[in-house]
């Protein structure tokens, strides 16, 4: 409750300065207000230009004076992300997208190119936040950290168009497209597939060429099950957990096919994970899925289930604490895309002045 009261008070203060702005203008004003609240200077090109952003900074400075908050590295990243989004008219859902949330997305290596991620070097290895589903805004469940190179190459591509890049590279025997190899484009395709609703059969046929990034929402239950089983190998005690999971499966035929799949996956992972670092262990799992036998046996197992059964298995496994540190949080279809602004393809909705205020108040209730 104290956090909600703080937000309500802050919105009330902003309303005194910006009572009649369009939604996009108000978003800019609130962003400037937060720049002032954390005493972070606007980039030079925007500091002198008349805009709701600069108005928000001035109003915030008049309100807070020297009573400002500490600007941590993640606060600065949060402000930078919001500025980048506002300049393009993209929406940012601010109830869940916080500096702490962005911190939880951090990884040591790019999931697409696998290069070590840098920070503020102006190189293509610099870490960036990608909207995995391009027709959605910056919202919880739709974000992943990757290199600037991978982010720029991915652009507006989704699952099917990324697959087409793979097919073109292979058909024309190209070294790559837009700086990514066929193998890297295949990872982009799988990453995008996580947040796009697919039929159960189609999702069952996809190899897990990239493990889901932290906090990403998986729309297809069979892929969530695929990731859950694969990630067992990232933590000690996997043998006992996998045996207990097998007991949850409906019938001997399904159990037999699951065991056949796992025995195809396991030796390939163990062979590829001689280094005991987290990122190399993840890569070993991802690379094991490149083996046709692994994918064939997975599809044979998974197609004996339906989406509802996959989801039920995950709920049962979570109840028995078989997650190996993986947090499973089911969402309804509506909750899964809350704040994504799919209706406006990820752009700030065009409402009349005061519209955003009413929406924010509804979110707080």
Predicted regions and their residues:
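N-terminal alpha-helical interaction blocks
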Residues: 2-79
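Catalytic cores of phosphodiester-bond-cleaving enzymes
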Residues: 33, 37, 56-57, 63, ...
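DEDD superfamily 3′-5′ metal-dependent exonuclease/proofreading module
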Residues: 45, 64, 68, 175-179, ...
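Histidine-centered nuclease catalytic patch
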Residues: 88-102, 106-148, 153-158
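Polybasic, low-complexity binding patches
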Residues: 132-144, 152-199
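C-terminal, charged low-complexity interaction regions
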Residues: 203-365
């Amino acid at each position: 409750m104290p956090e909600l009261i703080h937000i309500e008070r802050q919105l009330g203060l902003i309303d005194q300065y910006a009572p009649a702005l369009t939604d996009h203008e108000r978003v800019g004003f609130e962003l400037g207000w937060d720049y002032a609240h954390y005493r972070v200077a606007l980039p030079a090109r925007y500091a002198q230009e008349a805009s709701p952003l600069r108005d928000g900074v001035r109003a915030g400075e008049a309100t807070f004076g020297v009573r400002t908050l500490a600007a941590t590295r993640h606060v600065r990243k949060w402000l930078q992300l919001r500025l980048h989004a506002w300049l393009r008219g993209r929406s940012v859902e601010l109830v869940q997208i916080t500096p702490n949330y962005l911190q939880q997305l951090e990884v040591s290596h790019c999931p697409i190119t696998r290069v070590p991620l840098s920070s503020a070097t102006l190189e293509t290895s610099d870490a960036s936040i990608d909207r995995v589903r391009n027709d959605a805004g910056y919202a919880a469940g739709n974000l992943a950290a990757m290199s600037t190179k991978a982010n720029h190459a991915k652009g507006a591509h989704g699952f099917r168009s990324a697959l087409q890049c793979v097919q073109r590279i292979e058909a024309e025997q190209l070294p790559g497209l837009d700086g990514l190899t066929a193998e890297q484009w295949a990872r982009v395709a799988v990453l995008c597939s996580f947040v796009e609703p697919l039929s159960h059969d189609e999702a069952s046929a996809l190899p897990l060429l990239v493990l889901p990034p932290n906090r990403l929402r998986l729309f297809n239950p069979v892929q969530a099950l695929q990731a859950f089983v694969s990630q067992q190998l990232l933590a000690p005690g996997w043998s006992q957990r996998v045996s207990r999971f097998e007991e949850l499966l409906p019938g001997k035929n399904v159990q037999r096919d699951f065991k056949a799949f796992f025995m195809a996956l396991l030796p390939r992972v163990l062979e590829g994970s001689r280094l005991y670092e987290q990122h190399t262990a993840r890569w070993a799992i991802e690379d094991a899925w490149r083996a046709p036998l692994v994918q064939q046996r997975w599809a044979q197992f998974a197609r004996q289930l339906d989406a509802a059964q996959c989801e039920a298995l995950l709920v049962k496994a979570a109840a028995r604490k078989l997650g190996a540190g993986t947090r499973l949080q089911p969402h309804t279809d509506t909750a899964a895309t809350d704040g994504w602004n799919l209706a406006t393809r990820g752009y700030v909705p065009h409402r009349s002045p005061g519209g955003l205020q009413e929406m924010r108040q509804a979110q707080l209730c």
